[in-house]
Design a protein with these regions (language model features):
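Auxiliary Fe-S-binding modules of radical SAM enzymes
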Residues: 1-39, 70, 104-115, 130, ...
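N-terminal pre-triad scaffold of radical SAM enzymes
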Residues: 18-57, 72-78, 82-85
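Core AdoMet radical
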Residues: 56-71, 78-129, 135-168, 181-185, ...
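Short acidic, gly/pro-rich beta-turn/loop elements at beta-sheet edges
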Residues: 36, 50-52, 96, 130, ...
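Short connector loops/turns at beta-strand edges and beta->alpha or beta->beta junctions
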Residues: 45-48, 81, 148-150, 215-217
């Protein structure tokens, strides 16, 4: 794994790529990169939102790199990635929310990597259906949009996002024939029943894949961890989710 990790790191630096693995200070970077998988972040390294859990810099986004779609596609090719995950910062400063750039990136990846399956982890595009349509048109295998937390904590955790808007986005994508996925962070002060309710809400929006993980504080400035959720509780969540999905 270490050799592959070093090789990937060199490639990312040489191509000046933004991976959320690095900028988000993900603790599992060695494991994923060692296995030859990575998540690419497009649209720059500065986010227009300031979610309390995330280590990505906040500010006015920089100019889009028109060569980025090609660079990402080329890197996936060089790395031999079989399943690529692409995400982006929120670009509320752009008229189209970055959706054109997103579509170009997916098209470019397809062109250079016809056998690679694609997962796009998208922002909410402020619920703008025209922007969501651009993602639908390029038809990634999976479209992810993370709800992140339960409704009660949503305002505190993801300040400029809205719980109901995220559900709307997921339902809109599902109704358009997309395979949708969402993620929840646990250990932020939510109750078990609130997680169950969120799973029910996601299911009602047509979501077919949900990931649940432990929230980890990336720096002391970020939202504190309320609790480390016991593996048995995660098992309860898994079983509940599987029952909901029947």
């Amino acid at each position: 794994g270490d050799g592959k990790y070093s090789e990937m790191l060199k490639l990312v630096k040489e191509n000046k790529l933004h991976t959320i693995c690095e900028s988000g200070k993900c603790p599992n970077i060695g494991e994923c990169w060692g296995a030859g998988t990575a998540t690419f972040m497009i649209g720059g390294n500065t986010c227009t939102r300031s979610c309390q859990f995330c280590n990505v810099a906040t500010g006015k986004g920089e100019a889009l790199d028109s060569l980025e779609p090609f660079k990402v596609a080329q890197s996936i090719n060089i790395m031999g990635v079989k399943h690529a995950v692409v995400t982006s910062v929120d670009r509320d400063d752009l008229e189209d929310g970055g959706s054109e750039h997103w579509a170009k990136t997916v098209e470019s990846i397809r062109e250079f990597n016809p056998t690679t399956t694609l997962e796009t982890l998208i922002p909410d595009f402020q619920g703008n259906t025209k922007q969501l349509d651009r993602i639908i048109e390029v038809h990634p295998e999976i479209v992810s949009h993370n709800i992140e937390t339960v409704e009660r904590l949503s305002k505190e955790v993801r300040i400029q996002a809205k719980y109901q808007r995220s559900l709307f986005v997921l339902k809109y994508l599902t109704d358009a024939g997309m395979k949708t996925k969402s993620g929840i962070m646990c250990g932020m002060g939510e109750t078990k029943e609130e997680i169950y309710q969120t799973l029910r809400d996601l299911r009602a929006s047509g979501v077919s894949i949900v990931t649940l993980g432990q929230y980890m504080q990336s720096t002391p400035r970020h939202l504190a961890v309320s609790e480390y959720v016991h593996p048995d509780t995660f098992l309860d969540y898994k079983n509940y989710g599987l029952d909901e999905g029947k």
